[in-house]
Amino acid sequence: MKVRASVKKICRNCKIVKRSGVVRVICVEPKHKQRQG
């Protein structure tokens, strides 16, 4: 899980979702998991 100021899709499997006010990137590749913070 990477915590970044700007979350971006890294590959075509990445999806941007908003969970309880937090922007996250979910992906099949675990290295691509990101959270805005």
UniProtKB/Swiss-Prot annotation:
Highest taxon, organism lineage: Bacteria
Single Gene Ontology MF annotation: structural constituent of ribosome
Keyword Ribonucleoprotein assigned: yes
Stored PANTHER family: 50S RIBOSOMAL PROTEIN L36, CHLOROPLASTIC, LARGE RIBOSOMAL SUBUNIT PROTEIN BL36C
Pfam families assigned to the protein according to its UniProt record, in alphabetical order: Ribosomal_L36 (PF00444)
Family, per entry: Belongs to the bacterial ribosomal protein bL36 family.
Membrane spanning stretches: none
Keyword Hydrolase (UniProt): no
Species for this entry: Shewanella baltica (strain OS155 / ATCC BAA-1091)
Gene Ontology biological-process entries: translation
Protein known as: Large ribosomal subunit protein bL36
Alphabetical keyword list: Ribonucleoprotein, Ribosomal protein
GO CC annotations on file: cytoplasm; ribonucleoprotein complex; ribosome
